[in-house]
Design a protein with these regions (language model features):
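Long, compositionally biased stretches
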Residues: 1-11
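Domain-level detector of nuclease and nuclease-like folds
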Residues: 10-154
């Protein structure tokens, strides 16, 4: 709709950088698209992949992040990338696990081990990492209600 952001300040959750130029921001997928694809999204049809790529039902699925930090993350998993902001690391792991659980994405054993080790090393509260069945139901309902939002003319 040709709208542009005229100004503002944004706090990057990954690095705690305070940004004043919208062009420094990028939208990051908590679970990178490539990671999602190899973790199970390759089985999905176009509409589900499109919905995953644009999902707004869970506020931590898409993150407004400092572009340089997002580029450093790339398509890495927690075994090779963690955000530098120490106070955000446990939340980052929780959000990543939530997205994986919601979308039925798998983990390689090395990724699962790295996450388990990080939870211990960072002294994350294991109970805070739990995801309730009610949360999953709520998000699953949102997914089902919005599965037709992407281009309906595209044929698998």
């Amino acid at each position: 709709n040709n709208c542009t952001v005229a100004g503002g300040e944004w706090q990057d959750p990954y690095s705690e950088e305070l940004l004043t130029d919208a062009q420094q921001m990028q939208i990051d997928h908590m679970v990178p698209l490539k990671v999602a694809y190899v973790s199970g999204a390759y089985k999905w049809n176009y509409k589900m992949r499109c919905l995953y790529g644009n999902y707004m039902g869970y506020k931590e699925h898409l993150i407004s992040a400092y572009g340089e930090e997002n580029n450093m993350k790339g398509d890495q998993t927690p075994e090779s990338y963690m955000p530098p902001k120490v106070s955000y690391k446990c939340q980052y792991l929780k959000d990543l696990l939530f997205v994986k659980a919601l979308w039925g994405l798998t983990m390689e054993p090395s990724e699962a081990t790295a996450i388990k080790d990080l939870v211990g090393k960072l002294n994350c509260d294991p109970t805070a990492m739990q995801i309730s069945s009610e949360q999953i139901k709520e998000q699953s309902l949102f997914v089902n209600q919005n599965k037709d939002l992407c281009d309906q003319e595209y044929k698998d």
